[in-house]
UniProtKB/Swiss-Prot annotation:
InterPro entries associated with the record: Pro_racemase_fam
Name by which UniProt lists this protein: Uncharacterized protein BA_0901/GBAA_0901/BAS0853
Pfam families cross-referenced by the UniProt entry: Pro_racemase
Assigned protein family: Belongs to the proline racemase family.
SUPFAM superfamilies: Diaminopimelate epimerase-like (SSF54506)
MF terms (GO), sorted A to Z: 4-hydroxyproline epimerase activity
Organism: Bacillus anthracis
């Protein structure tokens, strides 16, 4: 065996959605801001993403993270997230997993509040403890807002409307009933197909761009909303993002975008609890902490709560003789 690269990771999951935290083998990442660091990774470190997200080391639904030094003077650390298509701007389930893993493995000190630099902006996370274990993690996300509502869509003789909202990334929100589908495993393949069609349709018709950050643009995912199954849940959802990737969790940034749409419609009030259920029957708890503005858009600061579990400690190698050493994806 010949080894040209060695990577170490700690893997975790949040309501079934994986997070692979890369703890060793990462070269220096250049950039003054976290957004600049994201661009650097896109230009120079995409091979690392492919090696650790793609098969045979990962899979189509794998999600990853690199913990960086803080980009701002008052933050504890920074995060960069990756998936099957590229490098994302924020990831809510990732924040929950990073805080849990960092505390339970001794990477982070045992404290309640953490300030995190993400490409989408500053995120504040809070750990709730049960003895020495992390019981749950809450995070105050970046200001989230409805970008456009009631956007008309016409695809394959179907006519319907979506709301476009930002929760750290841009999402289109649609009711699964528009297609006669339920948010369950049986209808998942059809939902994935619709997710890709809706994303491509919107991006062919309009430019979706954050009013203050040039680097935050495009539809990241499509949220399919449905009636809940569990007692006490408000809504059920599945998010299709990146290249047809399925979020197993309720999706942290998607939940933030959903909170923004519900608040804008008057369905969710400040301080009310919103229980967002996912396709694995897991739940995130969300609420509106405060009301603010992003440029000319009314926005909310959402709080999202969930829990994570460590699944493994791994060491991966790259053999230069292996024709598949950068990995591959089967959709």
């Amino acid at each position: 065996m010949k080894v040209s690269k060695v990577y170490t990771t700690i893997d975790a999951h949040v309501a079934g959605e994986p997070l692979r935290i890369i703890t060793g083998g990462v070269p220096e990442i250049k950039g003054e801001t976290q957004l600049e660091r994201r661009w650097y990774c896109m230009e120079h470190l995409d091979y690392l993403r492919e090696v650790l997200m793609y098969e045979p080391r990962g899979h189509h639904g794998m999600y990853g993270c690199i913990i960086t030094p803080p980009a701002s003077a008052h933050a504890d650390f920074g995060v960069l997230f990756m998936h099957n298509e590229g490098w994302s701007t924020m990831c809510g389930h990732g924040i929950i997993a990073v805080i849990t893993v960092g505390i339970e493995t001794g990477m982070f000190e045992t404290k309640q509040k953490f300030i995190i630099d993400s490409p989408a902006g500053e995120v504040i996370a809070y750990a709730k403890y049960n003895g020495s274990e992390v019981e749950s993690v809450s995070f105050e996300n970046v200001p989230s807002f409805v970008y456009k509502k009631d956007v008309p869509i016409k695809i394959d003789n179907y006519e319907f409307q979506v709301d476009i909202a930002f929760g750290g990334a841009f999402y289109a929100v649609v009711d699964s009933k528009e297609f006669g589908l339920k948010v369950d495993f049986k209808d998942l393949s059809a939902i994935q197909q619709w997710g890709g069609k809706i994303k491509h349709y919107i991006e062919s018709k309009m430019e979706v761009k954050h009013p203050l950050e040039e680097g935050l643009k495009g539809i990241y995912g499509v949220i399919f909303s449905d009636d809940p199954k569990g007692e006490g849940a408000t809504l059920r959802n599945v998010t299709i993002f990146a290249d047809g990737q399925v979020d197993r969790s309720p999706c942290g940034t998607g939940t933030s975008a959903r909170i923004a749409t519900l608040f804008e419609k008057g369905i969710l009030q400040k301080g009310e609890i919103f229980i967002h259920e996912c396709i694995t029957d897991g739940e995130f708890e969300g609420e509106v902490l405060s009301v603010t503005a992003v440029h000319t858009y009314e926005a909310v600061v959402p709080k999202v709560t969930g829990n994570a579990f460590i699944t493994g400690f791994h060491q991966f190698v790259v053999d230069p003789r292996d024709d598949l050493n950068r990995g591959f994806l089967l959709g």
